């Protein structure tokens, strides 16, 4: 059985005679007749009967007509889905993240991608940076987000944003700093930084910014993540430095002061495998590159 035979059969059934079906299909009548005979022989049943009114369907023909229409419709949809998958319009994008990009930059980027590619879906998994690199190389994830990824010849790293830094203090201390401050204003402030793992890390970058400015920071502790640092800040037990994506969230009892000065920014990075990119990843990478330029 061939798709051509199904197409011919549907045309004959709808037109009611071979000549009209041939005209609709833009073919001569003999090929249609031969294909209908071959189809009936293949199925072992009579589908069409000639009468004074033209060609009529047998009971088997009526049943087969319904199935033939469904088969061609399904084949058409399958073709559409296959072409869409080849373009990267459908499929699931597997995304891993580590650290604070999950607070703002990553959701906004994914929202823009899903708006432009509404038939795609996204899965999110928390992974350390080393786990992300391993997952990218193994093909278990498509793309990763964090800061300060380790370099590897098999993956590419694209910086998608640069974020301002903010001092986070308990609101009872907000009068000491106002809306903005400089690194030099923080010489005497004992800081709680994060994260504890994933070196080089956001904490390493903050310490490096202080030292580049000729200041030795006072580090009270390094905790697991931003949530732990801000929990201590809410409790009045710590002050911290956080990126803008974290400061944009309303945290009870915490005041933020933007840290001003040259080089006082940190990147958010996206990483993906350089080669053998599935279509949905290639489409997302195009989106990432456009966003990075903007």
Swiss-Prot record:
Gene Ontology MF term list: DNA binding; DNA-binding transcription factor activity
Keyword Transmembrane helix applies: no
PROSITE patterns found in the cross-reference section: HTH_LYSR (PS50931)
DNA-binding region, residues: 18-37
This protein's record includes keyword Transcription regulation: yes
Domain of life, per lineage: Bacteria
Pfam family name, one: HTH_1
Ranges for domain HTH lysR-type: 1-58
Record-linked SUPFAM superfamilies: Periplasmic binding protein-like II, Winged helix' DNA-binding domain
A GO-annotated cellular component: protein-DNA complex
Keywords assigned by UniProt, alphabetized: Activator, Aromatic hydrocarbons catabolism, DNA-binding, Plasmid, Transcription, Transcription regulation
GO BP term (any one): catabolic process
Role of this protein: Involved in regulation of chlorinated catechol metabolism. Transcriptional activator of the tcbCDEF chlorocatechol oxidative operon. May bind 2-chloromuconate as an inducer.
Family, as annotated: Belongs to the LysR transcriptional regulatory family.
Protein name: HTH-type transcriptional regulator TcbR
Species the sequence originates in: Pseudomonas sp. (strain P51)
Gene: tcbR
């Amino acid at each position: 059985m061939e798709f051509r035979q199904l197409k011919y059969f549907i045309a004959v059934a709808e037109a009611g005679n071979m000549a009209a079906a041939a005209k609709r299909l833009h073919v001569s009548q003999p090929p249609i007749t031969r294909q209908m005979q071959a189809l009936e022989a293949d199925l072992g049943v009579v589908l069409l009967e000639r009468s004074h009114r033209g060609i009529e369907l047998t009971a088997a023909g009526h049943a087969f007509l319904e199935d033939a229409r469904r088969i061609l419709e399904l084949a058409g949809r399958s073709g559409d889905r296959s072409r869409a998958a080849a373009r990267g319009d459908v499929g699931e994008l597997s995304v891993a993240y580590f650290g604070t990009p999950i607070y703002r930059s990553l959701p906004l980027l994914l929202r823009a991608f899903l708006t432009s590619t509404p038939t795609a879906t996204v899965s999110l998994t928390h992974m350390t940076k080393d786990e992300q690199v391993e997952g990218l190389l193994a093909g278990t994830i498509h793309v990763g987000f964090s800061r300060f990824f380790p370099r590897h010849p098999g993956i590419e790293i694209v910086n998608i944003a640069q974020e301002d830094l903010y001092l986070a203090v308990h609101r009872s201390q907000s009068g000491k700093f106002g809306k903005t401050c400089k690194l030099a204003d923080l010489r005497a402030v004992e800081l709680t930084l994060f994260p504890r793992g994933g070196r080089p890390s956001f904490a390493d970058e903050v310490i490096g910014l202080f030292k580049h400015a000729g200041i030795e920071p006072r580090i009270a502790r390094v905790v697991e993540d931003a949530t732990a640092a801000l929990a201590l800040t809410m409790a009045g037990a710590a002050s911290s430095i956080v990126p803008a994506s974290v400061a944009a969230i309303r945290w009870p009892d915490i005041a933020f002061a933007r840290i001003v000065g040259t080089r006082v920014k940190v990147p958010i990075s996206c990483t993906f495998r350089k080669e053998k990119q599935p279509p949905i990843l290639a489409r997302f990478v195009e989106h990432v590159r456009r966003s990075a330029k903007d």
